[in-house]
Amino acid sequence: MSIFSGIWIPLVTPFSRGAVDHDALRTLIGAYRAAGVSGFVALGTTGEPAALDEAEQAAVLATTLAAAGDLPVLVGVSGNQTASLRERIAQLNEVPVAGVLISAPYYIRPSQAGLIEHFASLADLSEKPLVIYDIPARTGVRIELDSLLTLAAHPRIQAIKDCSGSPETTLALILDGRLRVLAGNDDEIFTTLCMGGAGAIAASAHVSTERFVALYRALTEGRLDAGRALWHALVPLVGAMFAEPNPGPVKAALAAQGRIENELRAPMTRASDALHLRLKQLAAA
């Protein structure tokens, strides 16, 4: 069975007095392991990698790998120059990550032919499985279904974090069966799992983690009524977690629980006071 299933946590990077708080990161990972998650993403969007220098990124990845134990760790990679990303892939070939999560090149909006060439070039070099991260709202370019089906033929490309917002694309990929489809938009977790998706990479699951794991198990075991009840209870939390730019709300919720400091690096900002109060209430529920 593929490792790319279940509930994965795209970890925040905790800060304390401006520095990465590795102790808080270890504690979070330990709690999520105990809650039954299937894996972790280090240096994904929620982890503020653009705010970290190269040494900090390496240290965060090392801490995550050590704390994750036997659970798999994906590492996020992004950029808009194929050559520089190939250098990063070569570096990661020497690191014991379970795979690499790669988004489309941002800002420059390449053609579909360019996207196929880009991902294939990285997959050819990688010794690790690749998970395509389709998030057009952030990159400015959508990876079309035909392109994804072409890339699915590459043996290194094994899964997709699906933030396309297209239920037609999601279902087509699930029916094709070659890529493991992981929901990337948290408000689509229920529908993706009901369609036969493999799991989710869910920022909201930093809080009420056990409920997200229970939701996954209920739906994959065919217990629809139980899954629906769990999902309905989670909907307010999911909505609040994305009411303002990620990861501000996630960090606010964790800070409300006393698990991390409520710190981000500019230009990202803390959640508003009103949202912080709402998240505190939801996190305590």
Predicted regions and their residues:
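Alpha-helix N-capping/helix-start residues
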Residues: H22, E54, L145, E221-L224, ...
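Short, flexible micro-motifs
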Residues: I9, A42-A50, G79-T82, D162, ...
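A general structural signal for well-ordered alpha-helical segments in protein cores
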Residues: L25, Q57, L61, L85, ...
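Poly-acidic low-complexity segments
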Residues: D21-A24, N93, S166, R223, ...
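Short glycine-rich loop/turn motifs that provide flexible caps or phosphate-binding loops at active sites
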Residues: S5, S38, L43-T46, V75-S78, ...
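Catalytic alpha/beta core domains of metabolic enzymes, predominantly
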Residues: D124-L125, P136-F242
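Active-site beta->alpha loop and helix N-cap motifs at the rims of alpha/beta catalytic domains
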Residues: S2-R142, T150
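C-terminal alpha-helical cap/extension of soluble enzyme domains
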Residues: S2-P14, A31, A35-V37, C194-G197, ...
